Amino acid sequence: MANPGALGSITYESEATFGVDTTTFATLRVPIVAPVDCSGLVHNKIDSERVMQYRNDGSTWILGTMGGSFKTKLDLAGHGSTTSGAVTLTGTETLLGYVIGNVAASASAGTTFTGGTATAPTTTASGTFSAGSIGFAGAINDARGGGQAFAVSTHATTTLNLLTALGGLPTNGDVCYSAVNIYPSEAPTSTTVTSLRFLLQTANLSYECHGCFPTAFSLMGLNPGERPQIEVTWAVAWWRYSTATFPSTVATETYNPSMIAGGSLFVNDAGTATRAARTFRNFQIDYTLGMEILKGPGGVNAYQDIVGCRRTPDKIKVTWTEDADAATTSPVLPGFGTATTSKHMLYTSATAAGARFGIYMPKVCIDSVAVQKVDQNLNRLTCSGMAYTGTTTTNDLTLSAFRMGWA
């Protein structure tokens, strides 16, 4: 008898080797926000094309290889708790690290500001924030950090040198929040992928999916007033039915996101830390994940031809819309397009501690010259650019073309 399709569970674990036949899925019950859809799984059948003697005769079809895909849709919910103190990675952050490439805390714990300047505030802690990482400063409407994200150049003893200045000089005791950074690898040899196995459960059938890896993801709901989410597409090397107990008892996370409100968009010439916040109406990031499927022998299942995958270059495009300038011969956004200087950008989703995130892109090359258009009955300009590898070669984090900090 058919049961409600709204009921389901997806649990996972990382694999020791690609596609290994192991049946534990206890790392996390993924906090999905859309029903479990198994319809993308396939076990191919191939026409035998045998020559027959009668006009409409035929023969049994050949059983082919397994594969297919499924999707997981999650909220971009931030860290789930304050990062003013000690920081431990959550299960969702760890999962998204597998998707994009890496995950690491900016600092093992947050700290407090003691003074300094907007571009080089001083902190109680010494040398704890990683170069290239994201943090958050103060609270909304404090006229200083404002609860907004910042990007770190270096943390030299107690001086926190910033790539993106704060809104004002911090006051002694203002909170300096750590964050969890999710970012891609940039080294030319960093192409390996940790495969995962998932258990897709419904109130009827359940499926074990082995040799799983991300092939795409979409960032959604980044405009003011929207609910930020991410949807990941997972390829599957082989699968089988499961009779594992449902409902699952694997632990999950139920953190609610902040709506996109109270945040900011910093855009300035790359290398210039002076705060330059743009008043945006729409914001979008199109992240095309570079992933190549490897087919070959040696699979652990008789119907498995996918035996691995490798990362290839990603494509990261950022687009945002602003109101048109007053009459002028030098409007700002079109000037971004005609200039030859690359930008760096920092997006803050919201200001609520534990439910926000920031996105920093150290090198954005504008790919169009904005021309005025009518958008929602108002004159507006849309600017877009491609995010590329940063110029600071300290480590993968400083190089990363895209980094998301959850706090």
Protein language model regions, located:
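Signature of extracytoplasmic/envelope-associated structural regions
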Residues: M1-A407
